[in-house]
Amino acid sequence: MTVLPRIDPMLATPGRLPPLSSDGRYAYEVKQDGQRVIVYLPGDGTVGLRSRSGADITPAYPELGGLGGVLGGRPMVLDGEIVALDDAGRSDFERLQARMGLAGSPAKAARMARTVPAHLMFFDIVFLDGSSLVRAPYTERREALESLGLVGPHWSVPAAITGHGAQALETTRGAGLEGLIAKRLTSRYQPGVRSRSWIKIRLVRTVDVIVGGWVPGHGHLAGLPGALLMGRRDEDGSLRYVGSVGTGWSDTERVTLAGLLDAASVDTCPFTEPPPVTGARWALPRLVGEVRYTTRTRAGRLRHPSWHRLRPDLAPDDTN
């Protein structure tokens, strides 16, 4: 059996569409809203799934076990995203959250697989038949990926188009999708690197933040968070306050957040400079969330932030 190399996923840099003069030098793929995964197929019929952090999440997705038998004895390592699809066929992170974190509960994972099935979207291949492909250009890797015929009940290879980025972005907007990933055709695969060769183009501005505290709610929100206090890591590792967010979550999410914050409660402020907020309570800076916003102030605060989702798949160090 071939010993497969451990690969950290290559990451995209947030940005805008490439200029028209460079449009034809990029392939455009739909940005999926799920859990990044590196897939290990050693060629013996087994499957290994590792998250962006390197954690083994194979038991959480039993319906993907069939992958091990569809490609014969060819050893390979692939890159992709596990998603849960809504009724319109769009990736829905909120649905997927019911499946995440179940690697230690295989019986529950099997039950959830029947009600919230996972789908694995492949978009790259980095090792095949004993040879590393990380130094091969994107075009060669994509050709190798498409040649595998990875179409099944719980996996597929979404389309990629060369050029026509503006039209592709408008199509994703009309379909209610998050945006695009633009990949330079000549780009090599850079494990663990956030590369400018891949550009993440979102239709709304979002940012991952670290929750460092909260302000208790009042009235019917008594005992629940009224607003979360958000931070971002500076280069020296300190936590800088970037604003508070008090909208965007459902009643269920608010209750979930209350429990997480209560478990993370501490007496000391984790921010470099205490926020100018009355009645704040502090939390260990370990919860990561994603918020939407319109722009930033000169001081770096987020304007008009709205809560989008918890990011249990990210650690605080992954937010920069």
Tell where the protein language model's regions lie, with residue ranges:
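Catalytic cores of nucleic-acid ligases and guanylyltransferases
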Residues: 1-320
